[in-house]
């Protein structure tokens, strides 16, 4: 199935690219999410007419992500959790907890934007947490977990 991408999609292409995808991926994900449109002659003409508008919207999204990244880079967030001896937490700190702490400190962050490649945090200490704000913009936040 040939589609025209309406935004940049990781491992697939950039705005305006005409790509071949499996029919299920196109029908069930890209088209309903508004990330692509079928590559018919009418849609191609409509896309070319709207191209400047879509590129401007994509540039605005990236600019807002960069300003959020600059705000996040300056942040140092402390989360208090109950812990036993030797700093082992009762429970864990996940992406939702980190996103809530960042939002409370003034920068709106969704839990899907927080990246924890090693899984949830289960020890007290200092951690560098990656926040993926845009396909091209990633910020690192210093997270301090203390026993409370």
From Swiss-Prot:
The keyword Ligase does not apply. It holds the Pfam family Ribosomal_L9_N. GO terms for cellular component: ribonucleoprotein complex; ribosome. It comes from the Bacteria. The keyword Disulfide bond does not apply. GO terms for biological process: translation. Keywords: Ribonucleoprotein, Ribosomal protein, RNA-binding, rRNA-binding. One of its GO terms (molecular function) is structural constituent of ribosome. Disulfide bonds: none annotated. Binds to the 23S rRNA. NCBIfam families: L9. Belongs to the bacterial ribosomal protein bL9 family. This is Large ribosomal subunit protein bL9. It comes from Stutzerimonas stutzeri (strain A1501). The lineage of its organism: Bacteria, Pseudomonadati, Pseudomonadota, Gammaproteobacteria, Pseudomonadales.
